[in-house]
Design a protein with these regions (language model features):
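A structural signal for isolated positions on well-ordered beta-strands in alpha/beta enzyme cores
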Residues: 37, 72, 109, 136-139
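Mobile, glycine- and charge-enriched loop segments
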Residues: 101-117, 135
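Short, well-ordered alpha-helices that flank and scaffold nucleotide-derived cofactor binding pockets
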Residues: 23, 27, 61, 65, ...
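Short, glycine/charge-rich flexible loops or terminal/linker lids adjacent to PRPP-binding catalytic cores
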Residues: 45-52, 57-108, 144
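PRPP-dependent phosphoribosyltransferase catalytic core
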Residues: 122-145
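Extended interfacial segments that mediate partner engagement and assembly in macromolecular machines
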Residues: 1-62, 84
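Short beta-strand/turn micro-motifs composed of small residues
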Residues: 40-42, 112, 140-142
Length: 145
């Protein structure tokens, strides 16, 4: 089911699916985790151009609306391309370069659609902490599809 929902959002651009995914995150995640400013994991520039939208951004916006929380797009990707298709060792050895575009909120809820190795979330958390975040909690809709 998770694979179908992620695929519907990412590849068929069925944006209402993002709200359903956000509802599941809200329902399943412990309440203490779901606080702070919502920050989506930034997309690769090539993927954003090709798709014309940001699936993680849509999920983050839907979650922010459900939680009535602020949303901040304060991260961007720099180079290194796709993680999809890389083996675990490659992903860990060559994490994406993530940079903060602005100062980070003190408390952040980092949102992505799928967790594979955690290297992208780790890179995002490091970038957020480097510009002022003191608490970074990550949530994803699915793990390894």
């Amino acid at each position: 089911v998770a694979r179908n929902l992620v695929g519907a959002l990412k590849f068929r651009r069925l944006l209402p699916v993002a709200d359903l995914m956000a509802e599941r995150i809200e329902w399943l995640a412990p309440a203490h985790m779901l606080s702070g400013t919502i920050v989506p994991v930034p997309p690769a520039h090539a993927r954003l151009r090709r798709r014309g939208f940001d699936p993680a951004g849509e999920l983050a916006a839907a979650l922010a609306a459900r939680l009535e929380a602020p949303l901040a797009n304060c991260l961007e990707r720099r180079g290194r391309g796709r993680q999809v298709g890389r083996r675990r060792a490659e992903r860990v050895a060559h994490p994406p370069r993530i940079q903060a575009r602005s100062a980070a909120p003190r408390s952040v809820l980092l949102v992505d659609d799928v967790l594979t190795t955690g290297s992208t979330l780790t890179a995002c958390a490091k970038a957020l902490r480097a510009v002022g975040a003191s608490r970074v909690v990550a949530v994803t809709f699915a793990r390894r599809l």
